[in-house]
Amino acid sequence: MVRVRLAPSPTGTLHIGTARTAVFNWLYAKHEQGAFVLRIEDTDKERSKPEYTQNILEGLQWLGINWDEEPVIQSERVAQHREAIQTLLDRGLAYRCYASETELTAMRDAQKAANQAPRYDNRHRTLTPEQEQAFQTEGREAVIRFRIDDAAEIRWNDLVRGAMSWRGSDLGGDMVIARRAPADQIGDPLYNLVVVVDDASMEITHVIRGEDHIANTAKQLLLYEALGLPLPTFAHAPLILNAEGRKLSKRDGVTSINDFRAMGYTPDAIANYMTLLGWSVPEGMEEQFSLCEAAAVFGFDRVNKAGARFDWDKLNWLNAQVLHGWTADHLLEELTPLWAERGWTPPSEKSWCLDLCALLGPSLTLLKDGVDQAEPFFDRPDLQEDALKQLGIEGAKAAMADLLQRLENNPWDGSDVDQAKAWLGDAAKAADVKKGVVMKSLRAALLGRLQGPDLITTWSLLARIGEDLPRLRRCLG
């Protein structure tokens, strides 16, 4: 059975790169009727925090990505990691390196001065017992390094990139697999070693991650071989790029799923767009789809090698499509807590709230637009400059005065739309202006601006809560 994993480090909130990796893993698992599992890689003791773990788990659930087993906590498996390192030491495939940080810095500086690529020169690979004892007598601690044969040919078939080949000489010398510690101990195990041990223990069949891990894959394949562990299949998805074609980073601003949520993006749109970042839809399939619809056709034959540029216009279009497809009930459910954050208390009449949502829904791009556009229905707005200019047009206030008089003589409850339209025409005739002037002026009076949703429905909603007459009186001064 196919088993894939997401292995986030809880050193920050859920990043869109991790979210996209999660989506690809989940889609492949579901397509193959396999298992999607989580491993929390919390071995960075200084930066890992429980609140980040919680944020990652909540973010995945928000996106609609659920896991099939209890998450594995990497820090609880340190004994197994050290056991694997001891096995490598016992087999002569790893050794203790006593080179100090000062010596390693001097080595790298010399390489840089000679225009050489930085790499460890394997200086302590063949220490004699006497040399080791001398370093220990000095009080030196040691890292543990895994031997890498410069002549080694490392090959694998990548599901995205096809045949891949690396030489051992490309990997920077013997690899550190445990941090510095006294010579009679094994220090904290490091990433490449623990990932191999954990993936094998979890029986992961497919490792799906970003292309920035390709060099790690070459190193890890050597460790799989040295430890005699079964090899998974690898797939390296393209990086997510900014508009300039550089790897998306915090410098580009919004990179956290938290940020997207706060901006008013929906989980359906984000999950949809994460799928499109590097995957091409099959011919005949629309670009708006659910994760389950994508899972039915997902495969790595349609995952691109080239980097995926983040396109805000496409994301906004997708989000708008999602919002436009919501019922008024669903939109009201999502907007009610956002309105409450602004201190707004909607009328007790639910039908009014549903009608407001039905009015606003077709114009929304972000969920927070449903807050911005709802504001004049809850708070009486100031008259903006364009509204004041409109009301200053010859005949505009006369038309508003005529309309106000009609409403005071015959209050409108917002239900008879034909009557409202007739009043607009009558006011235009009375003030000797075009009907368009009356409509623009009424919008200015009611909303304080010239842009907004359907005028008659807007007027009806305000009339139903007794807000049309006060706003008309205000505009007349």
Curated annotation (Swiss-Prot):
Highest taxon, organism lineage: Bacteria
Motif ('KMSKS' region): 247-251
GO MF term set: ATP binding; glutamate-tRNA ligase activity; tRNA binding; zinc ion binding
PROSITE patterns, per the entry: AA_TRNA_LIGASE_I (PS00178)
Localization in the cell: Cytoplasm
Residues spanned by motif 'HIGH' region: 8-18
Keyword presence, Protein biosynthesis: yes
Ligase found in the keyword field: yes
Annotated Gene Ontology cellular component terms: cytosol
Chief localization: cytoplasm
A biological process from GO: glutamyl-tRNA aminoacylation
Residues that, per the record, bind ATP: 250
NCBIfam families, per database record: gltX_bact, PRK05710.1-4
Quaternary structure and interacting proteins, as annotated: Monomer.
Family: Belongs to the class-I aminoacyl-tRNA synthetase family. Glutamate--tRNA ligase type 1 subfamily.
Name of the molecule in the record: Glutamate--tRNA ligase
Organism encoding this protein: Synechococcus sp. (strain CC9605)
